[in-house]
């Protein structure tokens, strides 16, 4: 995984079709490519990418002070170090320097580590939506919306505002036969989310941009939304 866990429906479909056990891990190309993984058994934890591999250290850092490690259960930037971490980018000292904090590699992902070491990814740092001075993690809102029976899949993104901030909006792939009900969805979200996390608007998409693993590509969906809004204004 990168930046998000596999949607539970993707896991269920794969396991039902193959009869196998899907065990999820997490890493990046710079990590050769994995640093965290679930146990190869039913001890795996759905919604989590697992625990650090042997000889690999992972910590959740305060985004405002990377020297400070967050308490268990508190969101922060995922940092890692270990023998599989790359040494740097070829002929690009500036990018290499930006990728590390001391000996720790900066993954660019936000996550949470529980008391027992299991890690849950929250969002790519670049995908965090800043609205009214608050940070909104798209994955948290998407997880709630995916449980709604009228929604097949969803991408929560920021809709740019003139003042430089963003509105939280949801781009929806509706279930067969379902109709878009913005007010009903807002009421549903208000019962489950803090007020500032509730999407201001819901957009129906026939298809949402995804990668080969079936994960939503939020930045592509956001670009599609912006193009759509610009076309509607013209």
Give the label of every model feature segment:
Residues 82, 87-88, 110-197, 207-209, ...:
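AMP-binding/adenylate-forming catalytic core of the ANL superfamily
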Residues 1, 156, 203-204:
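Hydrophobic/anchoring residues in structured secondary elements
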Residues 23, 202-205:
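General small-molecule cofactor/ligand-binding pocket signal
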Residues 223-234:
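Acidic/polar alpha-helix N-cap and adjacent early helical turns
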Residues 20, 56, 151-152, 200:
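A structural micro-motif
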Residues 1-2, 6-25, 29-119, 125-128, ...:
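Conserved AMP-binding/adenylate-forming
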